[in-house]
A protein has these predicted regions:
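N-terminal helix initiation/capping motif
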Residues: 1-33, 99-105
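Short conserved beta-strand and strand-loop elements enriched in small hydrophobics
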Residues: 13-19, 50-62
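Short beta-strand-centered aromatic/proline hotspots
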Residues: 26-28, 65-72
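A residue-level detector for short acidic-glycine micro-motifs
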Residues: 32, 71-75, 85
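Short alpha-helix capping/helix-loop boundary micro-motifs
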Residues: 36-41
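Residue-level recognition of conserved beta-strand positions in structured domain cores
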Residues: 42, 56, 67-69, 83-85
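C-terminal output/interaction extensions
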Residues: 78-105
């Protein structure tokens, strides 16, 4: 399955995860986003394969969206997340935001 093109986006996001028997969170800054996932630089440490919840404030939306994602890669402090189980509203919102970001590039 081909991934959608990535668009540049710079927003602060929160990452919530369950590690070592407790809930933890960290924050970061996004670097790019596509309809399938988002890249970010984080303050915390995650491993590929971990499942997290991302809270992402997006342009064109009044509230941050909350999405489940899996860590697909890690390069130093940079991470790539693939979105999991998006509902139709989340998918439409992310698609609209990516189209908006593409017009600003």
């Amino acid at each position: 399955m081909p991934f959608s093109p990535l668009e540049l986006i710079d927003v602060r996001l929160q990452v919530k995860m369950f590690q070592a028997g407790e809930f933890r969170q960290c924050w970061g800054r996004s670097t790019e986003m596509g309809q399938d996932g988002i890249g970010a630089t984080l303050t915390g440490s995650l491993e590929p394969g971990e499942i997290v919840t991302l809270e992402i404030p997006l342009p064109l939306t009044p509230y941050p969206i909350k999405v489940r994602a899996i860590v697909r890669y890690r390069q130093g402090l940079r991470y790539g997340f693939e979105f999991l189980t998006l509902n139709d509203n989340q998918r439409d919102t992310i698609k609209r935001v990516c189209q908006y970001l593409a017009t600003r590039a």
